[in-house]
C-alpha cells in the first residue's frame, strides 16, 4: 500500500470554517472502552450525555474536551461522516507530529482526536424544545490531573491545531480550484 500524499488528504478534508473553544466534558472514561461508552453529566439540571468515540491504544483513564465545529457562517454543523474524515486527518501521523512540535511534548496517544456527541434532553414534563444534539471533535487526554493548567494548555494547542488544519484544507481546495481553472483556460 502506498502512502497518501498530504495534499490529497487536505483536499478531502471537510469544509470547517469555525472551531469553537474547548468545552471540558464532566466525566472520565476508561480508554479501552471509550469508543462505545456514553456518560451522563451529573452536574447538569437536564439530562446531558457525552459520547466520545475515542479509539485509544493506551490503557487507563481519559478525560475529554469537546470542540463544536461549523462549516459556514450560519453555524451549520458538518455531517458525522465529514467529522470522521476530519478526525482521521488530524490523527494522521505526519499531521499529528505538527501538534507535538507546537507543544514540544510527545503525546501519549496516537489517536487523541475523535468524533463526539453531546446530547441534552429536557427533564420529565418539559417541552422537547430544549432538546438538542451537537456533534463535534473530541480531544482526549491521559494526564494525571484532569483539567489542570497543563491539561488546558494541551486543549488550547489542540484548538490551534484543529483551526490550522481546517484552514489548510480550505487553502488546498482553493488552490486546486485555481489549478483546474488554469487548465481549462489553457
UniProtKB/Swiss-Prot annotation:
Coiled coil: none annotated. One of its GO terms (cellular component) is viral tegument. The keyword NAD does not apply. InterPro entries: Herpes_UL55 (IPR007622). Transmembrane segments: none annotated. It is found in: Virion tegument; Host nucleus matrix. Keywords: Host nucleus, Virion, Virion tegument. One of its GO terms (biological process) is viral life cycle. Disulfide bonds: none annotated. Belongs to the alphaherpesvirinae HHV-1 UL55 family. This is Tegument protein UL55. It comes from Human herpesvirus 1 (strain HFEM). The gene is UL55.
Amino acid at each position: 500500500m502506498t502512502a497518501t500524499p498530504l495534499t490529497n488528504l487536505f483536499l478531502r478534508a471537510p469544509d470547517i470554517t469555525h472551531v469553537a473553544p474547548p468545552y471540558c466534558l464532566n466525566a472520565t472514561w476508561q480508554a479501552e472502552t471509550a469508543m462505545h461508552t456514553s456518560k451522563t453529566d451529573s452536574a447538569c439540571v437536564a439530562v446531558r450525555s457525552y459520547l466520545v468515540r475515542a479509539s485509544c491504544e493506551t490503557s487507563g483513564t481519559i478525560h475529554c474536551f469537546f470542540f463544536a465545529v461549523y462549516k459556514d457562517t450560519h453555524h451549520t454543523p458538518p455531517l458525522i461522516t465529514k467529522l470522521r474524515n476530519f478526525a482521521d486527518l488530524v490523527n494522521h501521523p505526519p499531521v499529528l507530529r505538527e501538534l507535538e512540535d507546537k507543544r514540544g511534548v510527545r503525546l501519549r496517544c496516537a489517536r487523541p482526536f475523535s468524533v463526539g456527541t453531546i446530547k441534552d434532553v429536557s427533564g420529565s414534563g418539559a417541552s422537547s424544545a430544549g432538546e438538542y444534539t451537537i456533534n463535534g471533535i473530541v480531544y482526549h487526554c491521559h494526564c494525571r490531573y484532569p483539567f489542570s493548567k497543563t491539561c488546558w494548555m494541551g486543549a488550547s494547542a489542540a484548538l490551534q491545531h484543529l483551526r490550522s488544519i481546517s484552514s489548510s484544507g480550505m487553502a488546498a481546495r482553493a488552490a486546486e480550484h485555481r489549478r483546474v481553472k488554469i487548465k481549462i483556460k489553457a
